[in-house]
Amino acid sequence: CLVGSEMCIRDRGESFCHMVNGLPIFAMGADYIPEDSILSPRSPDRTRRLLEDARLAHFNTIRVWGGGFYPDDFFYDLCDELGLLVWQEFWLTGDTKHPHDQALYLANVESTVKRLRNHPSLAYYVSSNESTEVAGAKDLIMKLDGTRGYQMQSECDGVHDGSPYKQVNPMQHYENTASPRGSRVDGFNPEYGAPTLPTLETLREVMDEKDLWPINKEVWDYHDGGGFHLMSTMYKDLVNNYGSSQSIEEFAKKGQLVGAMNSKTIWEVWNYNKLDYGDRYCSGLLFWYHNCPVRQVCARMWDWSLEPTASLYHTCLLYTSDAADEL
């Protein structure tokens, strides 16, 4: 199996595109971030569950986010086993000042390429998340492994930057107006997604009942990255569109629906426009993000406890009912 990438030129613009055995594929996947921000020992069972659930959701690509850390060999062995392509970023996030000890950084790049280059799942190198590359990084990577594609960061060479990160009216995904940065349902997007409320059981693991309901904004925002995803405001307003809730049980149930509708809409839009089928040319979507590093009020298709949310069910149902039956 030969895996590569190229710039696909179409009447509707140009786009980065994964190629397998010379044929373009639609990259459907998510962004893998640290499994546990508390830095407790990583569990092979947890890693396997996360990657097997990715395949259950019909993903074919996993992006190793440059703002995290390098997974161990077991992660890449599993990607080989499960047929997941790996978009591999190196250890830089948005710091354009670069490390003080650049020689040490390049030594780390060299050891990483040597460790990973024999994995068939490894599809693509990206020097950083959202930063310029350290001088010499590209030449070193290409010298050590000239069989894979390369780009400087996740937002260049026909690849869009991320957004919207917040919940919006689902129709905005269809209308391509969900992001304040402009059109995002075009080409290849490695970082597009929206949060969903975790299960009620996980919410009760996050905070005391007195802060859970009525919603204590200060506490909820603390468990939402300082309110980054607007779970206590915008998300709450979207939930209230289905009627004011009288309990956390009622709010959590409606909150699952809000998250599911957004995830369903996002995947429907990209699926409709994949490759040359729709109104716009889309070659890939990697959902931000794949896994929760801590217990928090902003989950994705599953929460920190690995409990599937309604977003996962609707993603699976978009392609086949069989996968949803397995959950």
Task: Please give the residue ranges for each predicted region.
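Beta-sheet entry/capping signal
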Residues: 60-61, 83-85, 123-124, 147-149, ...
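Substrate-binding clefts and catalytic carboxylate motifs of secreted carbohydrate-active enzymes
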Residues: 176-321
